């Protein structure tokens, strides 16, 4: 899935997601895209689920670019373990998404098919998103 090959540190701080996206807020590769409207943490499973729904809708037509990648690890302690004794092991990888970030791009597809595919992908994501296009 979407996991970094190598990181400098194994475990990250939780941190906060504040402000708007400083980069990645315009369409770069395709002509249609899905833009985040609120801050959230995307897991690698959610990104993969959205990608699958897009590719099923497009049926081998056009190309899909994924603009979000999971860089942040989330740790969790096992059930029935008392507090203390260090930080838990890495449970999953997430991508911190700020408002305005383009998550997915599609190229070589008609407008109505791209809108349908990205609306299905939006249902798999934990935040509000909107459809953006060069043609509009």
Swiss-Prot record:
- Please give an example of a GO cellular component term from this record: cytosolic large ribosomal subunit
* Keywords noted in UniProt: Ribonucleoprotein, Ribosomal protein, RNA-binding, rRNA-binding, tRNA-binding
Quote one Gene Ontology molecular function term: tRNA binding
Q: Which domain of life is it from?
A: Bacteria
Query: One of this protein's Pfam families, by short name?
Result: Ribosomal_L16
Q: Which GO terms describe its biological process?
A: translation
The keyword Lipid metabolism belongs to this UniProt entry's keyword annotation: no
- Recorded family membership: Belongs to the universal ribosomal protein uL16 family.
Subunit structure and binding partners: Part of the 50S ribosomal subunit.
User: What's this protein's function?
Assistant: Binds 23S rRNA and is also seen to make contacts with the A and possibly P site tRNAs.
Name of the protein in question: Large ribosomal subunit protein uL16
Natural source organism: Ehrlichia chaffeensis (strain ATCC CRL-10679 / Arkansas)
